[in-house]
């Protein structure tokens, strides 16, 4: 053995020096999500929902939250475009959520601040079409034919 050369010993399983350091990649980037997986995991642990939290739970929850947010934003953007607006306001979010069947049931008990209410008029309160107005619009009768009596032969 050569006692002049010193061999560096690092921690087991780790690379000890040499190559360039790898840049850390977040779990959000690894999973292809925009929502913060690490923060959601921290909230799950801090909230004491369970003694232990698996590694896949925050990723799954972040994916679900991101999907719901994208769905609501898409429908609210459509509602804003229908109203000829470029900016989404709480009214557009309310219209989007309440007009969608599945989101409406999911967020049934939720109050959206400054959202207002859905426009709704009870059909009983709407004006009825009268029989006279309906008959005059269908076939107009001329008064000359109504006064003449049929000829007898």
Curated annotation (Swiss-Prot):
Region (Disordered), start-end ranges: 1-30, 129-153
Short sequence motif named SPKK motif, residue ranges: 149-152
Modification comment: Not ubiquitinated.
Keyword DNA-binding: yes
Subcellular location, record wording: Nucleus; Chromosome
Compositional bias ranges of the Low complexity kind: 133-147
CC terms in the record's Gene Ontology section: nucleosome; nucleus
Gene3D superfamilies to which the protein is assigned, alphabetical: Histone, subunit A
Domain statement: Contains one SPKK motif which may interact with the minor groove of A/T-rich DNA sites. Phosphorylation of this motif may regulate DNA binding. This motif is reiterated in both termini of histone H1 and in the N-terminus of sea urchin histones H2B, but its presence in the C-terminus seems to be unique to plant H2A.
Complex and partners: The nucleosome is a histone octamer containing two molecules each of H2A, H2B, H3 and H4 assembled in one H3-H4 heterotetramer and two H2A-H2B heterodimers. The octamer wraps approximately 147 bp of DNA.
Purpose of the protein: Core component of nucleosome. Nucleosomes wrap and compact DNA into chromatin, limiting DNA accessibility to the cellular machineries which require DNA as a template. Histones thereby play a central role in transcription regulation, DNA repair, DNA replication and chromosomal stability. DNA accessibility is regulated via a complex set of post-translational modifications of histones, also called histone code, and nucleosome remodeling.
Cited PANTHER family: HISTONE H2A
Protein name: Probable histone H2A.4
Annotated source species: Arabidopsis thaliana
């Amino acid at each position: 053995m050569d006692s002049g050369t010193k061999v560096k010993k690092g921690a087991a399983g780790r690379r000890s020096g040499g190559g360039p350091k790898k840049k850390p990649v977040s779990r959000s980037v690894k999973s292809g999500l925009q929502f913060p997986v690490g923060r959601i995991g921290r909230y799950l642990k801090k909230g004491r929902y369970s003694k232990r939290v698996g590694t896949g739970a925050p990723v799954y929850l972040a994916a679900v939250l991101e999907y719901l947010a994208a769905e609501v934003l898409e429908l609210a953007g459509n509602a804003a475009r229908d109203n000829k607006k470029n900016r989404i306001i709480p009214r557009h979010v309310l219209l989007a959520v309440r007009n969608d069947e599945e989101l409406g049931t999911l967020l049934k008990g939720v109050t959206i601040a400054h959202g207002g209410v859905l426009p709704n008029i009870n059909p009983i309160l709407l004006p009825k079409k009268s029989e006279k107005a309906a008959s005059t619009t269908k076939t107009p009768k001329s008064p000359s034919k109504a006064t003449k009596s049929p000829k007898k032969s």
